[in-house]
């Protein structure tokens, strides 16, 4: 892989991991169009590792929030009052919201790996329509401070849906938050905080299992480093941009993006450019891997 291609993949990962449009769908299709198949262990390792860059972007961007939540949760637990402060409660609610995706990933991973490009196209369109409904019907009034245990669990279930390729981790969780009445920015902020435990755990596992595939592959190793750095830096900027966008604007642009991407993938399948089935296991969706 050339360094230019690696940088483009890193940029694509950053954009589609945090925007509610599905990083899995875009990376797989972009890879197919450039002649990179997940049958190639080196490309699979590359795709997995560059996603660590966007995880790093979340950790750096929300470092103050994460430190405050962890400290408050630990302090409350030590004092025998684990839910004694708003920060402590939010910290434990994030843990609660992580459980559905962790359980679903453990039980369904191998079945989901068998899903093909038609599922990606369908998920892009279906979840785009749900996002449209959330945008039009939700009240958009609640803040992150208003998250309760029920909210965290329901948004956690939405995060588990991101196991389906094309759904987008950020897409399902932001949509879920909006349907529960949260503002667009609050839904996105909680979505990003909720992603931390599952992406750290699953990312560490995937890194451990895929890094050996790059041994002795100097060119691929350099390309992977470039892609990871680009995804981290660009990911930080995308988070900042998205939160600012959602503060004053709607998600309609992402609805259009999803519908157009789903239609484009369907057209590519029908024309024979993309295979209909999954020729190799896709990388886990953003929440579990390796989004959106």
Curated annotation (Swiss-Prot):
One GO BP: cell wall organization
Keywords: Antibiotic resistance, Cell inner membrane, Cell membrane, Cell shape, Cell wall biogenesis/degradation, Hydrolase, Membrane, Peptidoglycan synthesis, Transmembrane, Transmembrane helix
Catalysed reactions, semicolon-separated: di-trans,octa-cis-undecaprenyl diphosphate + H2O = di-trans,octa-cis-undecaprenyl phosphate + phosphate + H(+)
One Pfam family, short name: BacA
Similarity-based family: Belongs to the UppP family.
Matches recorded under HAMAP family: Undec_diphosphatase
Cellular compartments annotated: Cell inner membrane
EC number(s) from the headed UniProt entry: 3.6.1.27
Name used for this protein in its record: Undecaprenyl-diphosphatase
Keyword Cell inner membrane on entry: yes
Superkingdom of the organism of origin: Bacteria
Misc. comment: Bacitracin is thought to be involved in the inhibition of peptidoglycan synthesis by sequestering undecaprenyl diphosphate, thereby reducing the pool of lipid carrier available.
Key word DNA-binding present: no
Transmembrane segments: 1-21, 46-66, 90-110, 114-134, 192-212, 225-245, 253-273
GO CC aspect terms: plasma membrane
A molecular function GO annotation: undecaprenyl-diphosphatase activity
Membrane topology: Multi-pass membrane protein
Function: Catalyzes the dephosphorylation of undecaprenyl diphosphate (UPP). Confers resistance to bacitracin.
């Amino acid at each position: 892989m050339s360094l230019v291609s690696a940088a483009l993949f890193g940029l694509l990962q950053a954009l589609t991991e945090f925007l509610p449009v599905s990083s899995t769908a875009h990376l797989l299709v972009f890879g197919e169009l450039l002649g990179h198949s997940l049958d190639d262990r080196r490309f699979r390792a590359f795709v997995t590792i560059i996603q660590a860059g966007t995880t790093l972007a979340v950790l750096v961007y929300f470092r103050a929030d994460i430190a405050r939540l962890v400290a408050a949760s630990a302090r409350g637990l030590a004092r025998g009052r684990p839910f004694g402060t708003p920060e402590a409660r939010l910290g434990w609610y994030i843990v609660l919201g992580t459980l559905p995706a962790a359980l679903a990933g453990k039980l369904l991973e191998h079945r989901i790996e068998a899903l093909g490009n038609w599922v990606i196209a369908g998920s892009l369109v279906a979840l785009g329509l749900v996002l449209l409904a959330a945008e039009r019907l939700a009240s958009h009034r609640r803040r992150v401070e208003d998250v309760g245990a029920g909210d965290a669990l329901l948004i956690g279930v939405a995060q588990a849906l991101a196991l389906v390729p094309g759904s987008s981790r950020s897409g399902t969780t932001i949509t879920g938050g909006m349907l529960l009445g949260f503002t667009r920015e609050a839904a996105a902020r909680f979505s990003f905080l909720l992603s931390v435990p599952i992406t750290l755990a699953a990312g560490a596992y995937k890194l451990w299992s895929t890094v050996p595939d790059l041994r002795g592959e100097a060119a691929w190793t350099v390309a992977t480093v470039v892609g990871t750095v680009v995804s981290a830096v660009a990911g930080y900027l995308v988070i900042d941009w998205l939160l600012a966008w959602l503060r004053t604007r709607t998600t309609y642009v992402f609805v259009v993006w999803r519908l157009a991407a789903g239609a484009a993938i369907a057209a590519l399948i029908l024309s024979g450019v993309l295979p209909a089935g999954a020729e190799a296991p896709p990388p886990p969706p953003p929440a579990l891997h390796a989004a959106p």
